């Protein structure tokens, strides 16, 4: 039975709380579980549950968990839920010795009453068949006819109270008793009729089980409105947001775009009639969002804001259980576009992981080095491989790599600047040529011999204007004032 307690601790206790409350639990259990600082930082919920099972073999630490949750205001309801689950397991343990005695009583009843009491139509038919088999025995032994009649009446009376008992049991568990049908009706009819409303009730309960009281929270951020395809194959619009109270933060799926004007950064709002799963809220058409009054304002602690902005490490995501919802900003390493899906490989210093985008997340314009901000992606594990899968409400926001863009633009502009440099100096390079052609210049001068030497070392240098610009960079400015300088350019 300790395993049943551990299931409650892990699946209904640790799994549904957020990271902040989980850190509180680890801190409170550090002495009992002998957790060092590194273990408190790195151990996940599964590892803590294993240690709790070893330390508290009786109830796997469920009692401790209930005590902690009672002290946290936002986890009071969860503490009551865990308390009820613990009582259920305790009742099962107490009923084990009783079950060992019941079979002997049943065997005695079977000896006295051939028809076993039951509510199902198949058992009713069995009881009827048992009565029919008693018929020949009655004819063979007339002396026992009255006794057989009494027994058949007693068996019928036994079946009726058992049905009413079953009905009361189902009513106590929150379900209406199944409809009673005659023995002539087919067995499948009653079973299908009773199962359909039961399934509908379970589906309704699963939708409404996460309803919470109104909360007052500050808006930290909100995305733009985007399109998504509903389960009815209809194009609808929504947006994501992040809000925070004084004790924790929540990711919000807002399915009513008319509420977009309410979700303004740093605004205090009141959200009511919403649904909640772990630290994820869903606001729809039936929800209500209003601005808080002046007396309801508060400041969100910096630690909460820092944790809301914290990006999960990829190696930590690999350790999470399948179904874990992921939000975060990751670097794109590669992108593979298929016909219906796109594989985005994200990477950080701790590892890499594949992100499968489909629907609105398929083939989004991005390239290596860009950052992908993922909203509401679900972790899936198969054959020791972890992937982030896009779902109906998933969204990808692209942050372009501005550093790479600016570097590329500078590298592209550099050749253009070099090609444009000779243009403003063309006048200075052509002017010496015109002065060299003037009749005032003697045919043979020392400067001409110097140019001849220049040509010998660098053939074709005289025909290149750039060569003149390099050898006599200061020739052009004094043209208007000193012509002698132009006639005899300085040779370096």
Curated annotation (Swiss-Prot):
Compositionally biased intervals (Basic and acidic residues):
142-159
Keyword Nuclease among record annotations: no
Quick check: keyword Manganese in the entry? no
The residues covered by the HIN-200 domain are 199-399
What does the entry say induces or represses the expression of this protein? By IFN-alphas and IFNG/IFN-gamma in hematopoietic cancer cells.
Under InterPro entries, the record lists:
DAPIN (IPR004020), DEATH-like_dom_sf (IPR011029), HIN-200 (IPR040205), HIN200/IF120x (IPR004021), NA-bd_OB-fold (IPR012340)
Write the record's keywords in alphabetical order, separated by commas: Cell cycle, Nucleus, Tumor suppressor
Name of the protein this chain belongs to = Pyrin and HIN domain-containing protein 1
* Tissue expr: Expressed in spleen, lymph node and peripheral blood leukocytes, and at lower levels in thymus, bone marrow and fetal liver. Down-regulated in breast tumors.
